[in-house]
Every structure is written in C-alpha cells, then in structure tokens.
Amino acid sequence: MPSISTNIILAFITALLGMLIFRSHLMSSLLCLEGMMLSMFILSTLTILNLHFTASFMMPILLLVFAACEAAVGLALLVTVSNTYGLDYIQNLNLLQC
C-alpha cells in the first residue's frame, strides 16, 4: 500500500507541476486539473477502503461530481474563448483588458 500511495502522490505533484509550467494554454491547464482530480479520487478511495471509514464512503463520489462539473465548465469556457479570440491562451480571460 505505501508504494501505491507514493505513486499517486507523485502523480498529483506531477500534475501540479504541469499546471505551473504549462499555464499559458487553457487546454493544458484543464488536463492538469483533471490529472490532479483523478489522483485525489484514487488516493481518497484507497484511503477510505484501507482504513474502513464507513462514514465517508460518499466522499469519492462527491469528488467525482465536482470534477465532472469542473470539466464541463472548463470545456465550455474553452469553446467560448476559442470562438471569440481564436486562441486558447489564458491571458485572454483577463477582464481588465476589455
């Protein structure tokens, strides 16, 4: 179990570093966010099953619901920005540039 947890934590850190490095494009940021949410889901599921937390069996499901909502809003924003500006740069999302 510790090696699985270590690998999942490393996957989360890798996605976080990818978010910090590739922050200019919206699509790259969304992919890194999805990787972070997936690693958080797997880690929370393994922790709950391993430690027998019967009161918190719904937490991974709620995490998946929020991840799906985040993905839907992110893709809608990506389509809107791509249709408006023709690019998917995050700098186009600044409201002060109007």
Curated annotation (Swiss-Prot):
Topological type in the membrane: Multi-pass membrane protein
Catalytic activity, as annotated: a ubiquinone + NADH + 5 H(+)(in) = a ubiquinol + NAD(+) + 4 H(+)(out)
Q: What is this protein called?
A: NADH-ubiquinone oxidoreductase chain 4L
- Classification via Pfam families: Oxidored_q2
EC code: 7.1.1.2
Q: What does this protein do?
A: Core subunit of the mitochondrial membrane respiratory chain NADH dehydrogenase (Complex I) which catalyzes electron transfer from NADH through the respiratory chain, using ubiquinone as an electron acceptor. Part of the enzyme membrane arm which is embedded in the lipid bilayer and involved in proton translocation.
Q: What sections of the protein cross the membrane?
A: 2-22, 29-49, 61-81
- Supply the alphabetized keyword list: Electron transport, Membrane, Mitochondrion, Mitochondrion inner membrane, NAD, Respiratory chain, Translocase, Transmembrane, Transmembrane helix, Transport, Ubiquinone
Q: What class of enzyme is it?
A: translocase
Q: Chief localization class?
A: mitochondrion
Q: What does the UniProt entry say about where the protein is found?
A: Mitochondrion inner membrane
Query: Cross-referenced InterPro entries, in alphabetical order?
Result: NADH_UbQ_OxRdtase_chain4L/K (IPR001133), NUOK/Mnh_C1-like (IPR039428)
Name its GO BP terms in alphabetical order: ATP synthesis coupled electron transport
Task: Quote the Gene3D superfamilies the UniProt record gives.
Answer: 1.10.287.3510
The organism's taxonomy opens as:
Eukaryota, Metazoa, Chordata, Craniata, Vertebrata
GO function terms (MF aspect): NADH dehydrogenase (ubiquinone) activity
GO-annotated cellular components: mitochondrial inner membrane; respiratory chain complex I
- What family is this? Belongs to the complex I subunit 4L family.
**Quaternary structure note:** Core subunit of respiratory chain NADH dehydrogenase (Complex I) which is composed of 45 different subunits.
